[in-house]
Amino acid sequence: LRLIYFKILLVIVGFVVGSVVLAQELLPSPPPDHSLIYVLDQQNKLTALPFEQAHSPIHPNDVAKSTKSSYLELKGEHAAAVLAPTQRIFVFVTDRGGAHTPMIVWLTPHHGARRVTVTTQRGLAGFAISSDQIVKPAVRGLTKNGDEVFMELRPRVSLMPGEYAIIGGDLSRVATFRVSVASAQ
């Protein structure tokens, strides 16, 4: 009887230890190039996402004369990088007042290009991305060095197949990727 209880206890301990090991995630060390946006690949290595330049009729560095809706556009129908719906994204951000975390946004197709809707507000410089196109992230700070934080941006839910961008303040450096039906399975 003691042998049976011992075996049952051993099985329970095995399940508990196994589930704890599975629950732990690999947290990568910060890479040397802090200017790039990274994803964790299948081999648990950080790989940089390619950048594209966004074009827009608005001038985000100028103070807006009126409040209006417009767009940011990326040339081409598809991004070069294809990610899985739950791919982990890592970025360096500045931890200062007025600095914003780059946002994951859903892009819509438009005549061979990809777009996101933006709004400018009278009297302010910059732009706001339409809230229905922002992917709400779970943000986790991993390491901090001075006023720079290495963090993980993870969508709260799996991404649907489509085109996405990670947009910060510099429209010449927009990281893009797509989630295809094949990568979603």
Task: Describe the function of each predicted region.
Residues 7-19:
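Bacterial N-terminal signal peptides
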Residues 121-148:
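Extended, solvent-exposed segments with strong compositional bias
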Residues 79, 154-155:
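Short, flexible, glycine/charge-rich loop motifs used to bind or transfer phosphoryl groups or to couple energy/partner
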Residues 24-128, 168-185:
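Primarily secretory-pathway and cell-envelope proteins
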Residues 150-152:
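Ligand-binding face of N-terminal immunoglobulin V-set domains in extracellular IgSF glycoproteins
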Residues 1-6:
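Positively charged n-region of N-terminal signal peptides that target proteins for export
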Residues 84, 144-146, 159:
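Surface-exposed coil/turn segments at beta-strand junctions on protein surfaces, enriched
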Residues 155-167:
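A glycine-anchored, Pro-Gly-centered beta-turn/N-cap motif
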